Amino acid sequence: MSHHFPLFSSKNKGKPQRLPAKLWYQFVRYWQRNIWHKVVVCLVVFVVLSVGTMYGIARWYIASEAHKPLTMGVTFIPDYAKSLGLDPAKTMDAVLDELHVKHLRLVSYWSDIENDKGSYDFSQLDWQFQKAEAAGAKISLSIGLRQPRWPECHPPQWAVNEPKSVWQPQLETYMKAVIERYKNRPSLESYQLENEYFNTFGECTDYSRERLVQEFNMVKQADPARPVIISRSNNYGGLPLGKPTPDLFGISVYRRSWDANVTRRYFEYPFPAWYYGFLAGAQKLTTGKDTVLHELQGEAWPPNGQSIDQTSLAEQNKSMDARRLKQTIDFGKATGMRTIDLWGAEYWYYRMSTLHDPSLWNVAKQEFTK
């Protein structure tokens, strides 16, 4: 059955036609073509509307957060400093005194604190708190089984082969001991619970939501005054709407890594800064909770599973040099998130003191002293 459009009949030939009518006519004619044309049209419309909506949410979030002060900090892990041949205390002193860092993300590895079952050694974490407080810095303390740095989960050796019914209550007992020891410290600002919990990367065996909910409730009961941060998945668009709902969401942003599975080359994530602003904005709209950028890549990603100290400086520069660090920091600021913790402070100090390359350290110093 043919369609008849009077506006376009021979009677109207030579007469001026209104633009909306002409567009509608062209659209109808196009729509009458085969199914693949329709699929393409629908796909294009869907993509344009989706990206437009995402971008709009991102711009709203960035604008709504712009009035808040920017807090920049670093993650500091003594065990990692040791692995690079550094003195952890001296490294932390340099971070606080030379870079003038005022926000620290610290760890409380179960394997370090309860190396012997039932016996707690807080000495290493104690001196970190003391140094932070002497410098007037605030602390976000990572707690739980899964914490920053490989192998991601950090159980003591005596708990490795225990069934979950045994190690889980022991884990909670240790976590309560950590909270009780530090909850009255003036420098303690927040807890980060189970870093990147649902990421399967690393040597971990349990990802049950039930355990995460149970731990969250325990932490809030032990210290109701401090906000609890829980990580969302890094570059993925889905919103973490399942329980528990933390006080703040955390996100990690890595811009360049080594693809060991497919291309065996360095891989640059294509997402613009506003994409992460969209993730934070959508999170705020759906849950009412804000997002912090608690892990922004600031160190090289060695190829083929090598460690940093096995990798030449020239190779390290392929994934992180001074120019890229500055660009990454600017990228982090452009997301709109107002709390940013950089990843790699120990690495910057290693490059300066061991490899005699202060370029990254100098970039960080310029940023933290602005």
Pin down the residues of each PLM region.
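Short, acidic/polar
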Residues: 82-98, 170-181, 233-242, 321-331
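Aromatic-lined substrate-binding rim segments of carbohydrate-active enzymes
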Residues: 89-159, 203-229, 244, 360
